[in-house]
Amino acid sequence: MAASPVLADSSFYIRSLRARRDPLKELALAAATRDVAVCGVVRCEVGRALRDKGMLARFHKAWDVMMNVPTDNRLWEETERTLWELDRRGRIISLTDAVIGCCAKRIGAVVLTHDSDFALIPGVRAVNRLDI
């Protein structure tokens, strides 16, 4: 059975960069055994944090060859439903985490993250490291 795709959350990229590790190299290792995905929210959150234009261009080059999860009307409806259901149970998460989680669910991906909110989203598997 093939390994599930992985969608790295912004917290993975940012924590790796702060620790002076290259998140793109880590994801390239994962890509040897599974698909690596990105969504628009992650691109925007991470891209805005990159100060160096050369580094931003390098990230764009990597993201452009990853599986892109589109955010169409169905995804927004699923995100709204997820947030509504979580709110009713007293579980409040950010809109951006809900979108990323719904993107991961859409493609059957595991979320690579350091954010505990993803564990609250039904149907989302979240890990803080990959066993490569």
Which positions does each model-derived feature cover?
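Acidic, PIN/NYN-like endoribonuclease modules and their adjacent C-terminal/linker elements
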Residues: 1-5, 26, 101-132
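Generic structural signal for small/hydrophobic residues in well-ordered secondary structure
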Residues: 9-10, 46, 79, 104
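Active-site neighborhoods of divalent-metal-dependent phosphate/nucleic-acid chemistry enzymes
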Residues: 68-112
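A secondary-structure boundary/capping signal
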Residues: 9-10, 42, 114
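Short, well-structured N-terminal submotif of metal-dependent ribonuclease cores
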Residues: 1-38, 48-61, 132
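Generic preference for hydrophobic
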Residues: 38, 68, 126-129
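A generic structural signal for short hydrophobic patches within well-formed alpha-helices
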Residues: 13-14, 43-46, 118-119
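A general structural signal for well-ordered alpha-helical segments in protein cores
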Residues: 24, 43, 56-59, 76-79, ...
